[in-house]
Design a protein with these regions (language model features):
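Acidic/histidine-rich helix-loop elements
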Residues: 13-30, 108-109, 114-115, 193-203
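Conserved beta-strand hairpin/beta-sheet module of binuclear metal-dependent hydrolase folds
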Residues: 9-62, 172-186
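Divalent-metal (often Zn2+) His-rich catalytic cores of metallo-beta-lactamase-fold enzymes
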Residues: 181, 203-260, 264
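Core dinuclear metal-dependent hydrolase active-site scaffold
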Residues: 144-176
Length: 303
């Protein structure tokens, strides 16, 4: 697990591997990072297993012995939150912040969503054993926010903003304002096909969130996405994710308007701009089908 530093800033990050979480990558498929200040460390996301969270904590301790002041969670998906357990057990249980919809996922307001979390945990206990096992549990947020959270630690200003529902209902980004660094969570997938194949995904709102990122002034100088490599060209990273979503939506919109079946629509769509990207084989067809259903429901009033 290699630790990277943003040039000229006390901002550090870890990059996950391509592919779906499994034994070959030990669940390390997402990105996470942290910011060192004079008054403590601010962590963004915690990786996908307690073991990975502990290794992340070790990397933090290689840089600083400052306490973990707080953890910001981009969204409550397994590959970003199971590492919270390591911080709970080995870093003094620092406060965890997330957008308020996270409470539903952990069972705080919706039994069905709490059951979803338990089903995912059961699946990961099988797919990622022994890195996720019977001792693994979901750490709930200690604090939540609705739309926006601003705070300061050690003279560094932070902005956390909810951009969901997009990839997930609670999708949130964190801007380290003093250093022009953006942690985008899964609103941005860099250099690979995004994951849209979820009933929670709202592709129209996702595009609105990407438009918000392009409107930031001053524009960020560095972006750390939820998946894929970090980039010193945030505009390009935003554009790549946005162009893919727009392309899939337009292709499926035309298909719905022409009363085509999904199989017909998928077969006649030119995917050549994307078929070389990591995760294309694993995700693209499911992405297109999810958007097809979304637009079909919007057009014909389905559920």
């Amino acid at each position: 697990m290699e630790l990277h530093q943003v040039p000229g800033a006390p901002v550090y990050y870890l990059i996950g591997l391509s592919g779906v979480p499994g034994a070959e990558n030990e669940g390390h498929t997402s990105n996470a990072g942290f910011v060192v200040t004079d008054a403590g460390v601010v962590v963004f996301d915690a990786l996908g297993t307690p073991a990975l969270g502990y290794r992340m904590l070790q990397r933090i301790r290689e840089v600083t012995d400052q306490p973990i002041e707080r953890i910001i969670v981009s969204h409550y998906h397994a590959d970003h939150i199971y590492g919270l357990q390591a911080f709970e057990e080995h870093a003094g249980d620092p406060p965890v912040w997330a957008q308020q919809l996270a409470l539903g996922y952990v069972g705080g307001s919706s039994a069905s969503q709490g059951e979803d979390a338990e089903r995912r945990l059961a699946q990961r206990r099988e797919a990622l054993f022994p890195w996720v096992d019977e001792r693994t549990h979901i750490v709930a947020p200690d604090h939540t926010f609705e739309k926006e959270l601003r705070f300061e630690v050690g003279g560094v200003d932070f902005l956390v903003r909810h951009l969901g529902p997009s990839h997930a209902p609670g999708d949130s980004i964190m801007l380290v304002e003093d250093h022009g660094v953006l942690f985008s969570g899964d609103v941005i997938y860099q250099g690979r096909v995004p994951f849209l194949d979820s009933p929670q995904t709202d592709s129209a709102r996702w595009l609105e969130g990407l438009d918000y990122l392009t409107s930031l002034e001053p524009a960020p100088r560095f972006i750390i996405p939820g998946h894929g490599d970090a980039s010193s060209n945030p505009e390009q990273a935003v554009r790549a994710t946005r162009d893919y979503i727009r392309y899939v939506r337009e292709a499926m919109r035309k298909a719905v308007a022409d009363f085509m079946t999904f199989d017909e629509a998928y077969a006649q769509t030119d995917w050549s701009d994307y078929e070389h990207l990591p995760a294309f084989d694993a995700s693209n067809r499911g992405n297109a089908y999810r958007i097809f259903l979304e637009l079909e429901a919007a057009a014909f009033g389905g559920e």
